[in-house]
Regions:
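Juxtamembrane helix-loop boundaries in multi-pass membrane proteins
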Residues: 22-48, 64, 68, 90-115, ...
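Helix-coil boundary and interhelical linker segments in multi-pass alpha-helical membrane proteins
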Residues: 50-64, 118-129, 175-189, 237-248, ...
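Short, Lys/Arg-rich, polar N-terminal cytosolic tail immediately upstream
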Residues: 2-4, 10-29
């Protein structure tokens, strides 16, 4: 049975909040969550997977370009809204920064910028380089802030930990994907190394929390899919850095593949979880393992990876369609989340 944890829900956004977003004189903007940027991570990941699929299957490139443009437009919109929140509701922002759950979601902002950098390359290399520089610097700053907060905190409990804690780590592993084109190779190795190191540590902490403590709140169940992202992205980044499909790269890929399989066999359990805004976190990890599988085919030319990559890409497309339709329906029915 799924239990509901009491406390602040970083991914809760009601339709009432949605209607108040654009009015800074009303308190609705005060509740606009930083975690809303996780939607942009999903769109950026989907666009990247779609572009890789267009390359492998010789498809027109218009689809991925449109999704990247949409992600860019939404990024400007959401960033503007959150900037207004910082100006008018600074204490609410500080509460998010101090909260053990919402703290990790601040890394979704530099991660989105890094994904836009990937989208801009190679057609707009200068723009991509600027995005990458801002995203990489922001990601390093957020990682240092988050880790420092964890070290010196006095109120966190094991129940506060869950897979969203991987988000700051995932951002560092993304840096080399296009960073190898914009900066000395040692910088990519730097981000990759400590990102991988802290992924291993956090994996143990999160599994301990899942196995031996109270079940996560229903709205946080989708975050289990975040566990797919670090090894899948680690595989992609390692190949970008080395250019070779080594045994270590294969190790990373198959860890990500196994975690994906482990979660897919629990489809019935996940299907019983009602739609929340947090359901968007399915999308980015699904995109990561899809890209990794297509890259695996590109390197090995083994037909299995081609077929698996195609299947995952189709499933990812259906997932994105479901997320969009469910979000629209939630707005029409006056709420994203169930009442507390």
């Amino acid at each position: 049975m799924v239990r509901r944890e009491k406390g602040y829900d970083p991914l809760r956004l009601t339709v009432r909040d949605h209607h108040r977003m654009n009015d800074t004189s009303k308190p609705g903007l005060k509740n606009f969550p930083i975690a809303f940027f996780s939607i942009l991570m999903g769109l950026g990941g989907f666009a990247t997977a779609l572009r890789k699929g267009e390359e492998i299957f010789s498809l027109p490139s218009g689809g991925s370009r449109l999704v990247f443009i949409l992600a860019g437009i939404l990024f400007v919109l959401l960033s503007s809204l959150y900037l207004i929140k910082i100006v008018h509701h600074r204490e609410a922002v500080m509460q998010e920064l101090r909260h053990p759950v919402t703290l990790s979601f601040f890394s979704t902002l530099p991660i989105t910028i890094l994904l836009l950098s990937i989208g801009a390359y190679p057609e707009f290399p200068l723009l991509s380089k600027w995005f990458w520089g801002v995203g990489a610097a922001g990601q390093l700053g957020m990682t240092l802030y988050v880790l420092t907060t964890w070290i010196h905190q006095t109120h966190f409990q094991i129940e506060h930990s869950h897979p969203s804690w991987f988000i700051p780590v995932v951002g560092n592993i993304i840096v080399p994907v296009v960073g190898v084109e914009h900066a000395p190779l040692e910088i990519s190795w730097f981000y990759f190394s400590f990102g991988l190191f802290f992924w291993i540590i956090l994996q143990a902490i999160v599994l301990n929390r899942i196995f031996f403590h109270q079940p996560m709140a229903e709205k946080l169940i989708p975050t289990l899919f975040i566990m797919v992202a670090p090894p899948a992205l680690g595989f992609i980044s390692y190949l970008k850095i080395t250019g070779e499909l080594t045994q270590f790269a294969q190790l990373l890929y198959y860890i990500g593949g196994f975690i994906t399989l482990l979660l897919l066999v629990q489809f019935r359990a996940f299907s019983r979880v009602k739609f929340f805004l947090s359901s968007w976190v399915y999308s980015f990890p699904a995109a990561a393992i899809t890209i990794a599988t297509l890259v695996m085919y590109d390197k090995t030319q083994v037909i299995f990876f081609r077929q698996a990559g195609l299947a995952l890409l189709l499933l990812l497309g259906l997932l994105m369609l479901w997320l969009v339709v469910s979000t629209v329906n939630a707005i029409r029915h006056h709420g994203f989340c169930l009442p507390e």
